[in-house]
Amino acid sequence: MEPPNLYPVKLYVYDLSKGLARRLSPIMLGKQLEGIWHTSIVVHKDEFFFGSSGISSCTPGGTLLGPPDSVVDVGNTEVTEEIFLEYLSSLGESLFRGEAYNLFEHNCNTFSNEVAQFLTGRKIPSYITDLPSEVLSTPFGQALRPFLDSIQIQPPGGNSVGRPNGQS
């Protein structure tokens, strides 16, 4: 019996604050944050992410965010590209429609965590998934929540996944 093909799975991590969170968070929040994280999953030679337009893909590092600030090796998967794209299509029609996006509760990191677990059985690092609750646990975070809840983030430069001809 031939061993299954294994495909590497990477987590691309971007600091949307470009270092400002590290400098300003102690003053504004009373606690140190290392960054404001956007994440995506790289598998089968493409980068996949979730934003206010739904699930998108691009060549790795191909959004206007440029190259990631760090790359986490999530592991390997036996899931073929065909099965993975079917899975993404079903997610895009259910849990990860664009209108389901919420900066604190259902965001790019929620998507990356879900997909990482599907592909490898492993979660993404907790310093990323815990960030919203860390911010909201501060008085400043609570005061900003109504404004921040209205923010929709969609990194430019990706192609829609699971919609015919890239339609939204």
From Swiss-Prot:
Keywords: Cytoplasm, Hydrolase, Nucleus, Protease. This is Desumoylating isopeptidase 1. It comes from the Eukaryota. The gene is Desi1. Belongs to the DeSI family. One of its GO terms (cellular component) is protein-containing complex. Signal peptide: none annotated. Homodimer. Interacts with UBQLN4; leading to the export of UBQLN4 from the nucleus. The keyword Cytoplasm applies. It holds the Pfam family Peptidase_C97. PROSITE patterns: PPPDE (PS51858).
